[in-house]
Amino acid sequence: MSKVLIQNGTIVNEGRSFKGDLLVDGEVISEIYEGMAPRGIYDEVVDASGCFVLPGVIDDHVHFREPGLTRKADIESESRAAAYGGVTSYFEMPNTVPQTTTLEAWQEKRKLGAQKSHVNYSFFYGATNDNVDSFAQLDVHHVPGIKLFMGSSTGNMLVDKMESLQRVFLTAKQLNLPVMTHCEDTEIINRNMAEAKAKYGEDPAVEHHPEIRSVEACYESSKLAVELAKQFGTRLHIAHVTTAKELELFDNQEENLPKENLPKENLQNTDSVNLPQITGEAVIAHLVFSDADYATKKALIKCNPAIKTHADRDALRRALNDGRIATIGTDHAPHELKDKQGGCAKAASGMPMVQFSLVSMLQLVDEGVLTIERMVELMAHQPAQLFQVSKRGFLCKGYQADIVVVRPQSPWKVTKEVIQSKCQWSPMEGHEYQWQVEQTFCNGHLIYNKGAFDADYRGEELNFRS
C-alpha cells in the first residue's frame, strides 16, 4: 500500500482549523499531526502550503440520469464532474428510466455505479403508491434511504394517496430508514399554473415560476411531511427547503435541531446515537440565486422547487448557522440545453451544479455567510451522521481517505471548456471564483490533481448503518 503525506495545509475538521500534516496509508487516513509529521519515507508528498485540507464532500442529492436519460448525463460524466469539484460521495435519486422503484431496478443501478462511478456512490430507493411492501427486501446497509415525491416533478413519481404516504412513513420507521421528501403540493401548483396561463398565455415567462410553485405549495406539503414523521416516529429529511415559511417548521423545536459532535464510532448503532428526527436540506441554487436572477439567467435556473425571493434566500443562509438546515446538497439535475428554452410550461426544470458546489459555498464563506468549519459540517460531517455513512465524512484516523485540498485567493472563471457535465452548460458559466480545488482524493487515490484526472479509477459503494 502506498503512503501519501499531505503536508503544510490548514486541516478543517470537527469545528476546528489547524496547521498540520495528514498521512494516508492505502485507502485510509493513518495519522493526523498538528504541526509537522515525523521524518519518514513516503511514496508521495503533496505540499498543501497555503491550502485548506477538508473532508471530501458528501452530496446527498444528485440526479445522474442513468439509466434511460443518458443523452442528458450519465454516471461516468457526472461522477467525473464531482471529482473535479471535490465531491467524493453521492446519493443518487430514483427518477430515472426505469424508475428505481423495484428491487431489480435498484440492483441494476448499483451495478452501473460499480462499473462507471469515479467516486463513491449510492442510490435512493423510490416510493410509489403501491411498492411499500418491497422496502423490507432492501439491503439497508447499501441504501441511503427512501425518496418520496410528495409533489410532482421531473419523472412524475408523485405519491398522492394518504394511505400510501402513511405506509411509507410507517414502514421506513420499522426498517430504520430515513425518508427524504420532495415537498410541493401538486393541487396548489396546478391551480396556480392554470391561473398563470389564463393571465400570461400557454407558456408563462420563467419569472412567474416561483408564483406557480409557490411558497404555499412548498409549505403545505412540508407541513404534511413533518406531521407524518411525528405521527410514526420516522426520521425525515426534507429536500431543498426554499422558503422562510418552511423554516418555521423547524423553529423552536429543540428535538429537531442537529446534535453537534455525535459519537462517530457508533454511527452504525442506531440505539446509541441520538439522531435528530426531522431535518432539512438546502441546495446550492437556492443559496446562491434569488428570483432577481431570472432576468438574466432565464430558464437556466428553473428548478423544482422554484428559486424564491431574496428574503427567502437570506433566510436559508441564516438557517445554515442555527441548525434548521442540516445538510447542503446540489440537486444536480442536468438537461440538454435545448430543453432549457422557454418559460414555466415548456422549459425543463433542473441544472448541473455538482462541479461547483464546494467553490460556491467557499464563496459564501468569503462573504461571511458562514465559517469554513460550519461549511464542512454541512457538506461532509452531517450528511455522514444523519445517513449513518460508515467511516466517511471526517478527517479521522482509520476513516476512508476522502480528502479535498482547496486553495484560496486563486481566481478562475467558469468557461465551457472546464465544465465536465455531459450537458456542457452551467448557470455558473462566466462566474469568477476565488477558490480552486487543487486535489481530490477518493479512498486514498489521487483522482484529480490540478486539472489532471485519472479516468480509470472507480469509487466504492457507500456503506450505511454497518
Name each region found by the language model:
Residues 51-116:
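Metal-associated gating/positioning segment near the N- to mid-region
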Residues 112-126:
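A glycine-rich helix N-cap at a beta->alpha junction
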Residues 133-328:
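Histidine/acidic residue-rich metal-binding segments in metalloenzymes
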Residues 203-224, 228-233, 300, 318-328, ...:
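His/Asp/Glu-enriched, well-ordered alpha-helical/loop segment
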Residues 9, 27, 50, 61, ...:
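Divalent metal-coordination and catalytic microenvironments
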Residues 72-79, 129-138:
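Short, acidic/polar
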Residues 1-55:
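Histidine-rich, glycine-flanked metal-binding segment
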Residues 9, 343, 397-463:
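C-terminal cap of metal-dependent C-N hydrolases
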